[in-house]
From Swiss-Prot:
Its main location: membrane. Residues 26-43, 86-142 are periplasmic. Disulfide bonds join 35-38, 101-128. It comes from Acinetobacter baylyi (strain ATCC 33305 / BD413 / ADP1). GO terms for molecular function: electron transfer activity; protein-disulfide reductase activity. This is Disulfide bond formation protein B. The chain crosses the membrane at residues 9-25, 44-60, 68-85, 143-161. The gene is dsbB.
Length: 171
């Protein structure tokens, strides 16, 4: 069975919606406050979802457009994978090597230039190293990394797969 570009784009949109719904459920119904790294992971997931939604709605005929959309979606989810790797690494540090907790993301965005905020958040803080939720013995960042990695595989497949050449007749 050949999956159409539009079908796979729709699956990526659905994956983004499911991921964001679960994150918001944990935040608003289970009381888990997202740390700055969690928020950055959400940004990448939403970026991938928005690009996939545009690709789904546009349903490009041109292979060039298909590749551009797939590349942009891959960049978005790659951001989430990278931040999740950093998050998991912070959680595996010995307690004496965990960075101290800094101010919240809202304060940083209000008080500092964006470049400085990005540097500080990606450095991580003590709140990012704390494990507040586990499932089957793994923390939320580990599960997020697994989910994002699966989405990344689909995005890379969408980017690299062969598309049938559509020949149009000249009038």
């Amino acid at each position: 069975m050949q999956w159409s570009y539009r079908f796979v784009s729709g699956l990526l949109v659905l994956a983004s919606i499911v991921g964001m719904t679960f994150a918001l459920y944990l935040e608003h119904f289970k009381g888990l406050e997202p740390c700055p790294l969690c928020i950055f992971q959400r940004v990448g997931l939403m970026a991938m979802g928005i690009v996939a939604l545009i690709a789904f709605l546009h349903n490009p005929v041109s292979n060039a457009f298909k590749r551009v959309y797939a590349f942009l979606a891959t960049l978005g989810i790659l951001w989430s994978v990278g931040v999740a790797i950093r998050h998991v690494w912070l959680q595996t540090l010995p307690p004496d090597q965990v960075p101290s907790c800094g101010p919240g993301l809202n304060y940083l965005l209000d008080a500092l230039p964006l470049k400085t905020v990005l540097q500080q958040v990606l450095q991580g803080s003590g709140e990012c190293a704390a494990i507040h939720w586990t499932f089957l013995g793994q923390s939320l960042p580990v599960w997020s990394l697994a989910y994002f990695s699966l989405i990344l595989l689909v995005c890379v497949w969408q980017l690299l797969r062969r598309y049938p050449v559509i020949v149009t007749k000249k009038k």
